[in-house]
Amino acid sequence: RPSWPALDWLQRRFMRWFNQERTKAVLTFPVETMALLSKDGDVLDKEYADFTAQMYAEGHSFFTYMSDNADSLASCCRLRNEIQDNGFSYTLGAGGVSTGSKSVLTVNLNRCVQQATREGRPYTDFLAEIIDLMHKVQLAYNENLKDMLNKGMLPLFDAGYINIKRQYLTIGVNGMVEAAESLGITISDNTEYEQFVGNILGLIEHYNRQYRTKEVMFNCEMIPAENVGVKHARWDREDGYYVPRDCYNSYFYVVEDEQTDIIEKFRLHGRRFIEHLTGGSALHMNLDEHLSAPQYRQLLRVAAKEGCNYFTFNIPNTLCNDCGHIDKHHLRECPHCHSTNLDYLT
């Protein structure tokens, strides 16, 4: 039987130790996730809420996953696995070793919406055809995967590390913000934008349910798009579509818009906007400097109230290129050798 005092000690010890290790070397993995249960607009375990806030204040970098159900696991950028069989699972990076996504096929929403406008058609009709086709392609991919499995070509599946029946076929979305902008919709917490997001994600969810069987599960994920977001923007610009930036957003807000405050960002990644996003999205809250523990604690309450279930805080850490010193704060001069030859990382 698990010992809570021992587990509690180990979790706290590991987080404090790993936070210090990141002052010795640039470490991107493992990705830590603090899983918190919420109730009535706050974290249920107040002691761990305070510990989470303190760790953020001390400069630690980790995700927080918040749920009002104790049946969920999460890790990495966009992953959630719920034990209940309701077709709701974050899939980028596995919450359980055997669960994840076996294929991600991404739709360029900006291009689709603008093409529908060019043709004088409702964007939902145009998208319905594209999304239906995407599901058929995913099913074909799945049949190919099963054929490879039957021929013994997938050793990790055979060894039980990955369960093909628990792997999702994922419909990725990119260009949501840009698609809305092309229609003249203001990107903020407003009814028009909320309805636009709901129309698109609700449509994808409809097809996910339609194509789901006992053997095949689908979900929808707002992909990180570090690579494809740039490609979509470049391809669309070359073909004469409206392209407002060089990399399409992977958030529900415009990243470079300084008028969107912290609270609104939590709302735009809250339950009203992510309701149909069954594959997940992560709010990366970019800040210039670390907040205090009480400030982070208040933001945990905001997240619980707004239903923002997956988030982290990105603050530039200072890396000295001359002496190699790493500091948790956003500095203009190395405190160790006083060099100004610096780089920054989050």
Residue ranges and their predicted role:
Residues 1-165, 186, 190-343:
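Conserved catalytic cores of very large enzyme subunits
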